[in-house]
Amino acid sequence: MVIIQKSSFNKVILLLIFITTQFFSQEISGTVNDSQGNPLIGANVIIEGTNNGAAADLNGFFTIEFIPLDDFTISVSYIGFKTIKVTYSKNDPITNLQFTLIQGKLFGNEVIVLARKREETIKEVPISMVSIGKETIEDMGATSIEDLTAIVPNVFAYDDQTATGFNIRGITGGARNPGMATAEGVYLDGVIMGRPNFISSDIVDLQSVEFLRGPQGTLFGRNTVSGAINMITVKPSPVNSSAFLIEKGDFGYLKMKGSVNYRITDKIYGRFSGYSFDHDGYLTNTFDNSREKYKNNLGGRFAIRSVSTPKLTLDISYDFLQEDLKDISGHVSDWRISSRSSTFDGKPLDSIMIAIDSTVINDDGIYSYNLDSTGSTKRDLWGVTLNANYKLNENLNLISVFSYRSSLVVWSNDEDHTALDIMTGKWDNLGEQSTFEMRLVSDPNFQLSWLTGVFYYNLYERLIAPVYPKPLFFHIAAGIPMFLAEAQFAGATVEPEGKGNTVSVGAFVSADYTVSEKLTLTAGARYSLDRKHFKYRQDGIPSFGYVNVPSDSNGHLISGYFDSTKTWSAFTPSFNIKYSITPSINLFGTISKGYKSGGFNTDYVSSYESVATPFKPEYITNYELGIKGGNQSNTLFINGALFRMEYIDMQVSQFQDLFEGYSISNAGKATITGLELDFSLRLFNNSLTLIGGFGRNEAIFNEFHDGYFNGYWNEGEEYTDANGNGEYDDDEEFIDMDNDYSGEHISTFPKQSWSLMADFRMPINSKMMFVTQLRSDYIDEKLSQLSTDKDANLLRDDARTLVNGHFGIETESWGVFAWGENLMDTEYIIKQGVNGYLGFIEQLWGQPRLLGIRTTFKF
């Protein structure tokens, strides 16, 4: 009886607890939609710090039973969207809540850019540009700038083993010659990378990458005649977080990246990012059937942000890169060599060697080369940047950027690129750069907004690049009998050394004036002053075209250096007009001018005049008409432009001939016309994103006499036939003429290109998403190199289409993907050219199909 009574009592107590709980508990309910009002099926809604939560149903509706004892926070998340958190008190109404999630990556008109050194939406910027944000970079699985340029019309990057080259609107930047500046400006957090050796193309912890097409001479200044590439890193934040990526693929491919963000104090935050990249490569040296290390990179970045006062933000960063590689070479497509000997000139070297001593020097096809010695390359790069942003008042900010960068590249190489002991070489290139910029920026919300600033740049560079021609070189290249070559030229050396400073200062101003709600005018100007001081000497072999510098009246090398200083200045204005047809569609027009400073030939030189006479600055005027806009729902964005660029004194680096190597000269005039169009489109409730583009260029030398006089007779040059035999003989008088490329296409660019990326995402449940992406890009045929003694068709790269992609599963904290590059296994040429010493043609073929697995983690 007692037991029954206790049982009844317990039941009563449980019933009272249940009734009390139901009485005091509350139902949290509401809906989760995107910014267009579409329900987000499976969105995750949880009460932070508890196990209470729910997933949104087909209508985006959710309910949660919960007893609020104090303030509480609701977290709402969905794959591909920004998580939101809202805190409520226990007395707040918590039924019929409405949560609107924003896409994780800004899209279309919303994209924020720094193209004009202030934050604004991409639609408001009256120039032709593309911005790729952090989320898109991650979605693509992009690990290099080259990956990103595949979806940017009229911008191309060719990332070979040790460096990245760029071509924007048909203009290729720079040369290996330290006396020549680059044509495009590559910037990292507002700091110019003054030489290719300062650039790390591996993508690590980038917030966005902006591609500005056309000259940017007003705000970015010198050496941005083709455009600018603006890389912006992720800044430290007060939220502790970390992220890691591991990629494993064929051919010994292993890439690892990671970043950690830490809140040091309430007002000081720190961030560290690191990466490593190892790749055995896809090219085989048939000499010993080996694969040399194609990539072996280690890099990182430390950053600290201080917000000690509401008015002042300080960002300090240190980044570094270490490369330690084995040199590779290219497949020889045409063994015919250039020689002063009629016995060897125009004959294939492989056949010559079989005839001489039965030596086989051929490789095994396009993915192979044949070197008897393996060189190495080491690069140590580091830099530090200090960025300060001080709010003077509500309407004016003072911004300053200071930086220092240092790069040392040391390599040894098999210069002849064959299995023969013909020539070896070394390269020791040191670069040190310091920059400072200060600018005042007004509030952009006034009818007249403006910015103005000053800029200082100092670059020191030193290059020592000896080559060691062996007796076999003199035998083949000049026909000297082998026993004489061994007696006269054993231990021969050609050793150029160039060093010096480039100092540049500039002042700039730009202003926007809002004439009406629809019309805005922008005008700006910059004054630049460049001073180059170079010292040069070369221990040469005058009888073979490599002169001694400095030398006496007999051509003998003397002590000291050739010393030269030159100063150039330029005024580069710009004018823009922007007209809003609708709130989401703008027309724009641009007239802008670019300037690239002059310089000196400080590579191997064949005459005293070529080093003593600097090449001139180049100037470009850009005319541009474009449109930017999208639909009201912001699921479509289109950016298009027509352009015409007129060049004066375009600088061209080109191969001359066997004993002259590469030389820089000025084309008289060149004209580049074209168009570019890119779009972004979202379909099927944002589950499918399409990004594509089309570009076309027509680039012609209107007038180009390269000014190259080699000092000896070439086929086609006029001469006095003294003995009447109908052919030129030694010691007969001749007219040494330069080469005329007028009417020729500018090399290294494709006339036409297009790209398309399709990204499809489908929720598996409230926490997991299936992702698949395909990317395809097409490049038209192009001429690799201008040459004075080779048929242009031999140096023409065929058109190619590449298909890359990945698929996998991702959550808020991890992801697993299978990925592939060159899925169709297309055979294509990255670059080719004439061997600088023997004249045969080498080709570097692109990566064949590469498959791998990628894993990501976020904490």
What positions do the PLM features span?
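Short, acidic, small-residue-rich periplasmic hinge/interaction motif at the N-terminus
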Residues: 33-38, 43-48, 75-82, 91-138
